[in-house]
């Protein structure tokens, strides 16, 4: 769970992940690089908030709920919900570089961790396996575009994800061996993407 921690006392100052990014964007402007994008511009806040609710419910949370359900009907409900949302995102990203237009905003930050884990963890282990992220051309190139930004790629550790989800994860998969998969190949994230050229003005 992301959190802001007071490094002198060790106390958690804030762990409300629903509000954390927007609070950082609004309350820490003096500490943000002047060339960093405004991830929560005032004129887009209502639309950003609405999209964040959709992404959370239909993707970020839904992939975890699909793994935690105990019956086929509920599993299929979340499965269908996830892939309907991925289809919707694929269409949205066919028209613009980022989720809210031509610059990175809060929804891009919120969706990235789930995208980074999708083929590696959710597709395989959580049985959310209709399509892989790489099977969505716009969504895949968008994810690689984000990853090529050091703020995303520089903080993404695929090996740690493997270990966390396959070896130390405590979700109800006791019947599965605790093996850390060798794949998929992480180097595909370094392949060029077409987003900048596709949406250059």
Question: PLM features: residue spans?
Answer:
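C-terminal alpha-helical interaction module
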Residues: 1-201
């Amino acid at each position: 769970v992301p959190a802001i921690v007071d490094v002198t006392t060790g106390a958690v100052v804030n762990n409300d992940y629903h509000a954390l990014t927007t609070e950082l964007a609004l309350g820490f402007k003096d500490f943000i690089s002047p060339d960093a994008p405004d991830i929560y511009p005032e004129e887009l806040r209502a639309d950003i908030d609405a999209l964040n609710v959709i992404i959370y419910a239909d993707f970020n949370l839904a992939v975890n709920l699909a793994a935690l359900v105990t019956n086929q009907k509920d599993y299929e409900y979340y499965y269908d919900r996830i892939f309907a949302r991925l289809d919707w995102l694929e269409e949205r990203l066919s028209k613009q570089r980022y989720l809210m237009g031509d610059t990175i905003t809060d929804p891009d930050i919120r969706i990235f961790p789930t995208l980074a884990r999708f083929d590696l963890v959710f597709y395989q282990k959580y049985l959310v396996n209709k399509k892989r992220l790489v099977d969505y051309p716009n969504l895949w190139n968008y994810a690689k575009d984000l990853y090529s930004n050091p703020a995303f790629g520089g903080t993404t550790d695929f090996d740690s994800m493997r270990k966390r989800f396959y070896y130390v994860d405590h979700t109800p998969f006791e019947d599965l061996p605790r093996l850390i998969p060798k794949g998929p190949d992480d180097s595909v994230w370094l392949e060029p993407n077409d987003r900048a050229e596709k949406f250059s003005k």
